[in-house]
Amino acid sequence: WYSSMFAANIKQEPISHHNHHHHHHHGHHQHQQRHNSNSNASSPHQSPLPNLQLEQYLKQQQQQPLMWSGLPNPMQTIMPANMRPSPTAATAATTTELCAPTTTVAAIAMQANDKLQALTPPMDVTPPKSPAKSQQSCAEPEKEHDLMSNSSEDMKYMA
């Protein structure tokens, strides 16, 4: 009987680790959301919705201080997210800086943006107007898809 108790205790170790891992996954999910709302917010005059999304995201952000406990990880998660829409990356960084009450977010976005500029200078130099518009048009379905695939992943994770 005792041995089974100990086995249960030992089994709980990886479970708690798994929980932490799940939070990590959730953090990644939130970064996806942020990337999406930012690519939309690059032209806020088109629709007021992105600002709402950003506000929602920031509220979630404050509820989950867990994400910032490991700073290097959000950095890694944020890099690919910013890499995809590189024309809007600069706008994303400034948007975050203006709206975010947490300066950490802005700092991380800025760092990522610096790295991004160093990695892909030609793409940043290209006139940002037309790519931003095309980005806007294809960002809508992509946003839906991203959010849906992410939430299903989360569900799988929790089940």
Swiss-Prot record:
Give positions of region: Disordered: 18-49, 119-159
Localization recorded for this chain is:
Nucleus
Q: Which GO terms describe its cellular component?
A: nucleus
Single biological process term from Gene Ontology: segmentation
- Superkingdom assignment: Eukaryota
Basic residues: which segments have biased composition? 18-34
Biased composition range(s): Basic and acidic residues: 140-159
Record family assignment: Belongs to the hunchback C2H2-type zinc-finger protein family.
What is the name attached to this protein's record? Protein hunchback
The protein's role, per its UniProt record: Gap class segmentation protein that controls development of head structures.
What are the entry keywords? Developmental protein, DNA-binding, Gap protein, Metal-binding, Nucleus, Repeat, Zinc, Zinc-finger
Q: State the taxonomy lineage.
A: Eukaryota, Metazoa, Ecdysozoa, Arthropoda, Hexapoda
In its UniProt record, a GO molecular function of this protein is:
zinc ion binding
